[in-house]
């Protein structure tokens, strides 16, 4: 904050900037929406990439802070957790929408809610639901192109719930999943039902004709190929009748009926390894599956972009405690990151300190 004050106002404006972030009432949603629309032309986005963001904290008064497991770093720590939506395309990427993930303890802690100015309607919810809400706002409410949604769900047990919810909203997705997670339940006519993992589906398809293969670009470490197969959900035409149904998901409201959607399972198989490097679940149809390597590359690139943002755009440098302050801070981070795409003159800056 002091560095911005010195550079922009010649010093002495730090307190005003703090107030602008923590106490002002400007609407962050409007700024994000307008920023996203301005970025569509320069970025030519091909996908919306959803990532987890982690804000390590020392105390326990900042909004949403708790000792909790951060999937993206693989450990427990005292932190705030959020999710961010990137517009991503060949020309670059930029974060355009954000959600703060509230831990369950914050629902009933009226003292901390009051001190953090947390709105009454903000509560803990499953991650998959938060993803659906922020994506729905970004695409439907802001009227952005309905491009595929790419999310890493390896460490989340609600893959099926997220997939079904996105299908209800008519949104295509590319979800990274754990190969050992349940994918479908096979129900032979004269045997007990058996649940197959995503790895089982891929393994079974390598011995059939229902498989699509691409050789991966040379820039992918290990080379190899990407293989994809349709996730069965109807009787197979084989020697015995079997019915494949999606693995069980959490209950959804009775008003939400999932439309019939073809799903594909894909695995990235390097030539130097015996097993798959990554496994994916997608609603891309057969004619669009050739674009899957591009979405995987975009997802990998965003991970590197996010790490750079922590330093270059000052993402982790929020010192306030309020709900609105957090949203103002991350919105300004989006604006700072977008400057390289919106300004015709490229400006190189050092890390924010």
Question: Which sequence ranges carry the predicted segments?
Answer:
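Short, conserved catalytic/metal-binding motifs centered on acidic residues
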Residues: 4, 47-56, 85, 148-156, ...
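Short amphipathic alpha-helical "interface-anchor" segments enriched in bulky aromatics
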Residues: 54, 288-320
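Basic, amphipathic alpha-helical segments enriched in Lys/Arg and hydrophobic/aromatic residues
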Residues: 315-353
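Domain-level cores of phosphate- or acyl-group-handling catalytic modules
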Residues: 115-188
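Electropositive, glycine- and tryptophan-enriched low-complexity nucleic-acid-binding patches
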Residues: 15-19, 73-145, 274-278
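Active-site-proximal, Lys/Arg-enriched surface segment
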Residues: 25-104
């Amino acid at each position: 904050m002091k560095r911005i004050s010195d550079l922009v106002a010649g010093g002495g404006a730090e307190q005003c900037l703090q107030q602008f972030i923590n106490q002002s009432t400007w609407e962050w949603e409007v700024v994000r929406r307008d920023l996203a629309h301005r970025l569509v032309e320069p970025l030519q986005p091909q996908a919306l990439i959803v990532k987890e963001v982690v804000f390590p904290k020392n105390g326990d008064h900042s909004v949403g802070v708790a000792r909790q497991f951060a999937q993206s770093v693989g450990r427990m720590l005292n932190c705030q957790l959020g999710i961010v939506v990137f517009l991503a395309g060949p020309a670059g990427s930029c974060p355009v929408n954000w959600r703060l993930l509230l831990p369950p303890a914050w629902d009933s802690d009226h003292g901390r809610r009051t001190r953090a100015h947390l709105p009454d309607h903000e509560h803990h919810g499953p991650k998959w639901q938060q993803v659906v809400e922020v994506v729905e706002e970004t695409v439907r409410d802001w009227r952005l192109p309905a491009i595929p949604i790419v999310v890493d769900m390896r460490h989340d047990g609600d893959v099926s719930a997220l997939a079904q919810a996105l299908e209800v909203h008519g949104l295509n997705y590319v979800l990274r999943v754990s190969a050992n997670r349940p994918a479908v339940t096979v129900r032979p006519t004269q045997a007990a039902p058996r649940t197959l993992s995503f790895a089982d589906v891929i393994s079974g398809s390598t011995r059939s004709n229902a498989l699509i293969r691409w050789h991966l670009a040379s820039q992918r470490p290990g080379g190899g190929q990407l293989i994809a197969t349709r996730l069965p959900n109807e009787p197979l035409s084989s020697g015995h009748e079997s019915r494949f149904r999606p693995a069980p998901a959490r209950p959804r409201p009775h008003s939400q009926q999932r439309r019939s959607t073809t799903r594909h399972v894909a695995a990235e198989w390097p030539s130097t390894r015996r097993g798959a490097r990554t496994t994916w679940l997608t609603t891309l149809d057969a004619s669009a599956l050739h674009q899957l390597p591009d979405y995987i590359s975009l997802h990998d690139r965003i991970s590197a972009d996010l790490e750079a943002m922590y330093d270059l755009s000052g993402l982790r440098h929020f010192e306030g405690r309020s709900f609105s302050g957090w949203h103002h801070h991350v919105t300004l981070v989006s604006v700072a990151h977008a400057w390289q795409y919106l300004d015709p003159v490229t400006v190189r800056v050092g890390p924010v300190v």
